[in-house]
Every structure is written in C-alpha cells, then in structure tokens.
Amino acid sequence: MTQGPNYRIKFRRRREGKTDYYTRYTYVINNAIRFVPRLTNKYVIVSVSKFDQKGDIMIAYAHSIELVKKYGWKGDTNNTPAAYLTGYLAGLRAVKSGVKAAVSDIGLFVPVKGGRIFAVIKGAIDAGLKVPVGDLGKLKDRVNGSHISAYAQKLKNENQELYNKLFSSYIQRGLDPVLLPQHFEEVLNKIKENGGK
C-alpha cells in the first residue's frame, strides 16, 4: 500500500474519483461559473454552479429523469439524445437565471470525441449558454438518436430476436426505437414551449 516514508495519501475525494483538485483550484482562482455535466449508469445530471466559501452555489440544475416525468421521454435516460436534452434544459434554466457564459467542468471523465459529455455541452450551447469547447461537428448526426434508429432498423430486418432483446425497454415503454428521432423532436419542442420550467 505505502511506498516508503515520503508517501503522501491523496485527498479522499480524489481517491474516490470524485474531484480533480488541480482543475477545481483553477476554477476557484478565476472565479468562473462552471457547467458541470455528470454521467451515471442510468442518468445524466447537469448543474451550473459557482464557488462560495461555504459550498458551491447551484444556479441551475437538470436531471434526465425530468425528461420522463415532465416531458414524456420514452427513450433511455442516459443515451446521447437524453444527454443533449438534459444539457438543453440546464442551459435554458441557466440563461433564465442570468448566466451568459460558463466553463465546462467534466471532472475526471476522459474526453472522447462524440461522447455523451459533449452532447450535454452542445445542448447547453444550443439553449443560448456560451461554453467554450472545440469542434462538435461529429455530434450533429448523433444528438437526435438517428444512429440508434438506424441500428434498430438494421436489427429489426436481420435478427428480430436480438432486436426484441436489446430494445425491450423501448418497446415496453411504447416507443418504436426506429422512430426515436421523431420522438426526440417532439420532446425538444415541448421543452422549448415550456421554457425549461
């Protein structure tokens, strides 16, 4: 476990893989408002927060379960379209709260091109929040779930048994996965009409 007399134990939250203290320190020094997307095995959680000595102040918050409860989302709550919609919802709420720009804080996630983290950020940018980030062109075709729809169509034609197994949760909720892009547009329009409330 230890490696001699000079071994230094890392902070608990760093050991648990929760906090990157070096990056957090730079945000605190710059007094930056942070756009914080987090992915779990089931959900996407997004918050817009700023530093305070007593603890971070939450300016805006969105959880992907809200998509199901408030807007009738029938897809998964942690896939790319759900990540985009959750980011869009958080972005709308942040803009309503008076935040114009924020810095993305992806924590200890490894940035991967076309990943869900960047789908969340793209959603916030499309909602009107300025978040400095590189090229998100690869996400254009993925945020509405067309890649999921194409795969579902392929499986439906080739292997019906595997299709029923992989997309059982979609079918159980009453959504044909081939129609996911249309359902995405419906939910996005509901969020726009509601104004992110």
Curated annotation (Swiss-Prot):
Superkingdom, natural source: Archaea
Cited SUPFAM superfamilies: Translational machinery components (SSF53137)
Originating organism: Sulfolobus acidocaldarius (strain ATCC 33909 / DSM 639 / JCM 8929 / NBRC 15157 / NCIMB 11770)
Role, per record: This is one of the proteins that bind and probably mediate the attachment of the 5S RNA into the large ribosomal subunit, where it forms part of the central protuberance.
Gene Ontology BP, a term: ribosomal large subunit assembly
Name of protein: Large ribosomal subunit protein uL18
Quaternary structure and interacting proteins, as annotated: Part of the 50S ribosomal subunit. Contacts the 5S and 23S rRNAs.
NCBIfam families referenced in this protein's UniProt entry, alphabetically: PRK08569.1
Pfam families, per database record: Ribosomal_L5e
A cellular-component GO term for this protein: cytosolic large ribosomal subunit
CDD domains in UniProt: Ribosomal_L18_L5e
Keyword check for Ribosomal protein: yes
Keywords of the record: Ribonucleoprotein, Ribosomal protein, RNA-binding, rRNA-binding
Family: Belongs to the universal ribosomal protein uL18 family.
GO molecular function: 5S rRNA binding; structural constituent of ribosome
